[in-house]
Regions:
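Gram-negative bacterial Sec-dependent N-terminal signal peptides
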Residues: 1-23
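Immediate post-signal peptide segment of exported/extracytoplasmic ligand-binding proteins
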Residues: 23-40, 59-61, 164-166, 366
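Short, surface-exposed connector motifs at secondary-structure boundaries
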Residues: 35-39, 61-65, 88-90, 283-284
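Extracytoplasmic ligand-binding site segments that recognize negatively charged/polar headgroups
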Residues: 42-56, 67-83, 90-233
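A ligand-binding cleft/hinge motif common to bilobed small-molecule-binding domains
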Residues: 104-106, 230, 235-255
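Periplasmic-binding protein-like
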Residues: 140-143, 207-212, 252-279
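Conserved C-terminal helix/tail region of periplasmic/extracytoplasmic solute-binding proteins
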Residues: 227, 332-366
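Mature extracytoplasmic/periplasmic domains
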Residues: 267, 271, 276-337
Length: 366
């Protein structure tokens, strides 16, 4: 037998061994997770990013119970839940978190999360993950206006429109900008538009924008939700496009809803997954991560209008059904999307969370 043939056989044998090893590892993880009996999640509303279907899919596949904590929590609340339950292995201690990108590095630095690399690790873009596996991007979207067109006859097309008198008592955020990543990003996006795209000035400009909107009486200081949109309490909600589109589908035309990607200040936001350093069910947490980053989990997010972090990999392998692609908004709305760097996010997060009370002075009711 030639040396070339031996090399081919050796390579094939290694591939088989690698596959068998991965299968054995997977079986061992499943068994360990089932022995723990459950997974505790936090801040996962079922209408956010298709999480209802994601959770149902995980339960059906592995038969694990999921203890769902505080679906309406913001990223800051998730971090506080880990801190508050460091010495608690009970039902209030989250195993996993899904937070805004800027919360990943800070959580790692604070020793609140632990490293784990999923099987599909290599297909996650390097720019969207911690090199050591402490956190990695899960999905992204762009900031949008969700508008109840039964009540708002002239739909706003850009941020500056929201300051017009015709939108009095109409505009809300989908979270509290002192703790919610979604709301922090909304304030920054408004500032990015007001500052002509200057990232260094956008945080302060965003606060001024909302201060002006609040003084004009256009800002409604409650967390906007699908129900408040339909009732007319918050006929315009600034939120991620995937939440707005899911809300539109939920309402089924009653009332009619239009989702607008603004002409300027088009902000893209990445969220990240991580496992708590104090997870009561660490193996269930790892199995959850494996599920989320599998083709099945990634497509479940896409079905909920979120662009999964492995989107390009799935598209290259023709894994995305055409019907799913057809449900997404037109690509041109995303052409001007800006992905802020981690340093930029850390800077404007600090400005917005610390200065909201003094500059805007609006206390957000839940």
């Amino acid at each position: 037998m030639s040396r070339h043939s031996l090399k081919v056989l050796a390579a094939a044998a290694l591939a088989v061994c690698g596959t068998q090893s991965a299968m054995a590892q997977s079986a061992a993880l499943i068994a360990a997770a089932k022995a723990e009996g459950q997974l505790t999640t936090i801040a996962l509303p079922h209408d956010w990013c298709g999480y209802g279907a994601v959770i149902a899919g995980f339960k059906a596949k592995y038969g694990l119970k999921i203890n769902e904590l505080n679906p309406d929590a913001g990223s800051g609340d998730e971090i506080e839940a880990i801190k508050a339950n460091k010495d608690n292995k009970g039902p209030q201690a989250p195993d996993v978190i899904d937070v805004g990108l800027s919360f990943g590095p800070s959580s790692k630095a604070a020793g609140l999360i632990q490293p784990y690399k999923v099987a599909t690790w290599d297909s996650i873009p390097a720019s969207a993950k911690d090199a050591d596996g402490y956190w990695y991007g899960d999905y992204y979207g762009v900031m949008s206006f969700q508008v109840n067109t039964d009540l708002i006859s002239k739909v706003p097309t850009d941020w500056a429109d929201l300051l017009k008198p015709e939108y009095k008592n109409s505009v809300s955020l989908a979270g509290d900008p002192r703790v919610s990543s979604q709301a922090i990003q909304a304030v920054y996006a408004a500032g990015l538009s007001a500052a002509g795209g200057d990232a260094s000035k956008a945080g302060a400009a965003g606060l001024k924008f909302f201060a002006d909107m609040n003084k004009a009486g256009n800002f409604v200081p409650v967390i906007g939700k699908t129900a408040s949109l339909a009732q007319g309490t918050t006929p315009i909600i600034i939120s991620w496009d995937y939440n707005a589109l899911a809300g539109r589908d939920t309402l089924k035309g009653n009332p009619k809803v239009q989702v607008v990607v603004p002409k300027s200040g088009v902000l893209a936001g990445v969220y990240v997954q991580a496992i708590s350093a104090y997870a009561p069910h660490p193996n269930a947490a790892k199995l959850w991560m494996e599920y989320l980053y599998s083709d099945e989990g990634q497509l479940a997010w896409l079905n909920g209008y979120c662009h999964p972090i492995r989107f390009n990999d799935l598209a290259a392998k023709n894994k995305i059904p055409k019907a799913m692609m057809d449900k997404l908004p037109p690509a041109e709305g995303y052409a001007k999307a800006v992905f802020p760097t981690l340093d930029q996010q850390s800077a404007y997060k600090e400005v917005i969370t610390k200065q909201w009370d003094t500059v805007v002075g609006a206390n957000i009711a839940k």
